[in-house]
Amino acid sequence: MEQPRYDEAKWPILLVTMPPEELAGPDLLLHMDRMSAFSKRGVQFVQVIDVRAASSLSAKARRLVAERMDQDEEVYPHILVGVAIVLATPMHRGIFKAITWLSRNPRPFEAFSEIDEAVIWARGLLRAQHSLTLPIAPDVTKRVG
């Protein structure tokens, strides 16, 4: 069975291309472990997941993915900044919505039809997140106060 491809060339944007066959059982668990490993690094990042050629996930698989994302958020808070999904069909959009509804932790989720659009969104999200977490320089606070 073909496995997902993980492309870190644009890190901290992670591009994941899902295979045509549905991931299930040990293959799905391996994929989720690999995705969790990116959070373990402790560096904020955005996932861009290309599912245009992928088959749909079962309801059980959708629940497992959402649960793992929630677990990762609890252990590594605010590391996964957002998720962009590149979709080709309305069926994929429905699966994507189901995963976002199943997740307990709010994070930006956005659907796109092209990878380039998703990467632009991911860059903007990281830029905005970075500007929110930058410390205020001491000389600026002196001038304001």
Whereabouts are the PLM-identified features?
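Amphipathic, Lys/Arg-enriched alpha-helical "gate/interface" segment within cytosolic domains
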Residues: 1-145
